[in-house]
A protein has these predicted regions:
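Periplasmic-binding protein-like
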Residues: 60-61, 133-144, 206-248, 271-274, ...
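Catalytic and substrate-binding regions of cell-wall glycan-acting enzymes that process beta-1,4-linked
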Residues: 378-441
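Export/targeting segments at the very N-terminus of extracytoplasmic proteins
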Residues: 268-316, 350, 367-368
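A ligand-binding cleft/hinge motif common to bilobed small-molecule-binding domains
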Residues: 117-128, 191-225, 392-393, 397-402
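Substrate-binding/active-site groove segments that recognize
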Residues: 320-344, 350-362, 405-407, 431
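Short, functionally critical alpha-helical segments immediately adjacent to catalytic or ligand/cofactor-binding
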Residues: 302-318, 353-357, 380-385, 431
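Extended ligand-binding regions for polar small-molecule ligands
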Residues: 34-39, 75-87, 146-166, 170, ...
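Extracytoplasmic small-molecule ligand-binding "clamshell" domains
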Residues: 22-23, 36-119, 123, 127, ...
Length: 459
């Protein structure tokens, strides 16, 4: 005991506020304003169920989703998200964004529910967002222009600003001259090294493989590290995160995620010779027949690049191609098919493309209306290759075994059970590969012109 009388609690509080009120009041006001401007909202799944839609924002590309105008949308992420929305019994709405930063901003503002950024899970820019279970494992790669002799430690390396790749290069190659580019997309990074502005760029293996035909001069220098890709979800939306994780876990366990990933990745790989051959054929052979592809595609309301991809798989755009079984011409028609479609000269490119496009349209018309794009295209391609009866049989097997006869991934599994069906599965895969390559080739001109305007080198 000191002998001093203890002050009442009220007196202590009063003196405290008298001494510190000038600091406390402004702090409280700032806190109130902050909460009003940035409310810590806890979202519930009822919000988008009542709205009836899942709002997704992402960067369009060969590894995510590709809009085809009137011909629909397709791609790994589109099909995965479509299945997720179907499971929730709501519609899927997809908005394109120019870069990952725009995706992140939309999620932070609550303008979208879910985002496709293409960024590794450990990317610093994703801080504050909800991150789902991974849907894909990738490998970060150092990409060079063929013939580069500089070691990475002596070279100029381009990465996206404030990215996981920037952190990685700082750790692995601290001596390197690292150029951080603001808002850089995979296409823009690859174009930078393709034009010789830098010596190397860092990009994941799936992004490079999907774009390799557009950049025949680029090659792999070395693999750096593995990374995980996930869906990004608006901040504090724990309900949607739980639904997403449950869906990704289920599709991982039943194998559908792996089958979908395989379908969109196995056909992407071109070796160096294949890339250069394809580019040479695009420059020398395609211009000879492109007008006919466009004319017949317009007649049947289809994408001319799909028709061109079919022809490339059939003959490599060689009007005099002949197979061991006797099919010939740019569309490699059998004699019976040529007679059925009313043409007399299979080696005449105009007649061959006319008959081939009409025959493909006949297969499309046989597919039931319950089958939507892109499944409709894949089934029609299989029917074009081996006959509609086989596709019909595979759909019947799908229905009998509890799978979805309107989904290509399910139908293709049962198609494997039929004799000689393997060739049709490879055929669909290869046509998709060439189709994606032609889409990528055609789309590069749209952003190449504005490349200099969009880029700002980070300080």
């Amino acid at each position: 005991m000191t002998g001093k009388k203890a002050l009442p609690a009220v007196t202590i509080v009063k003196r405290f506020f008298q001494q510190y009120w000038r600091r406390i009041v402004p702090l409280c006001l700032l806190t109130i304003i902050s909460l009003q401007l940035h409310p810590s909202k806890q979202y519930t799944v009822d919000e988008f169920l009542e709205r009836g839609s899942l709002r997704v924002i992402g960067i369009a590309g060969p590894t995510t989703f590709l809009p085809h105008g009137e011909h629909g949308v397709r791609g790994l992420q589109y099909e995965l998200l479509r299945q997720f929305a179907n499971d929730l019994n709501i519609r899927l709405e997809i908005e394109q964004a120019p870069n990952a930063e725009a995706v992140i901003a939309a999620l932070e503002k609550g303008e979208a529910d879910l985002g496709i950024t293409g960024l590794a899970n450990n990317d610093p820019r994703l801080a504050g967002l909800e991150i789902s279970k991974p849907y894909l494992s990738t490998t970060q790669q150092l990409i060079q222009r063929s013939g580069t002799r500089l070691s990475p430690s002596e070279a100029k390396i381009a990465v996206s600003q404030n990215s996981a790749e920037a952190d990685l290069i700082e750790q692995l190659q601290p001596e390197a001259d690292v150029v951080q580019l603001r808002y850089a997309t995979p296409d823009e990074l690859l174009e930078e090294v393709n034009q010789g502005q830098v010596d190397y760029v860092v990009i994941n293996d799936s992004e490079f493989a999907a774009r390799r035909t557009a950049f025949p001069q680029l090659s792999l220098k070395k693999q750096l590290t593995t990374s995980q890709l996930s869906w990004t979800i608006r901040p504090r939306d724990k309900q949607l995160l739980r639904f997403a994780n449950r869906f990704l876990t289920q599709t991982g366990q039943d194998g559908s995620l792996q089958r979908l990933s395989n379908f969109y990745s196995q056909g992407n790989t071109f070796n160096a010779f294949g890339v250069k051959t394809f580019q040479k054929d695009i420059q020398q052979r395609l211009p000879l027949y492109q007008a006919q592809f466009k004319k017949q595609a317009n007649t049947h309301d289809m994408d001319w690049r799909l028709l061109a991809a079919i022809a490339y798989q059939e003959s490599k755009w060689d009007v005099n191609a002949v197979s061991p079984t006797g099919v010939t011409g740019i569309m490699m028609l059998t004699k019976n098919t040529a007679e059925e479609m009313g043409i007399t000269n299979r080696n005449n490119p105009q007649q061959s493309i006319l008959a081939g496009s009409a025959y493909y349209q006949r297969m499309i018309d046989k597919i039931p209306d319950t089958v939507h794009e892109p499944d409709r295209t894949w089934m029609a391609l299989a029917a074009y290759n081996m006959g509609y009866r086989h596709v019909l049989k595979a759909r019947e097997l799908s229905l009998k075994q509890g799978d979805d006869p309107d989904k290509w991934l399910d139908v293709s599994r049962h198609l494997r059970q039929l004799p000689r069906a393997g060739q049709a599965l490879v055929y669909v895969q290869e046509v998709r590969r060439y189709y994606d390559a032609l889409l990528l080739q055609d789309s590069r001109s749209h952003w190449m012109a504005s490349l200099e305007k969009k880029w700002v080198v980070a300080e």
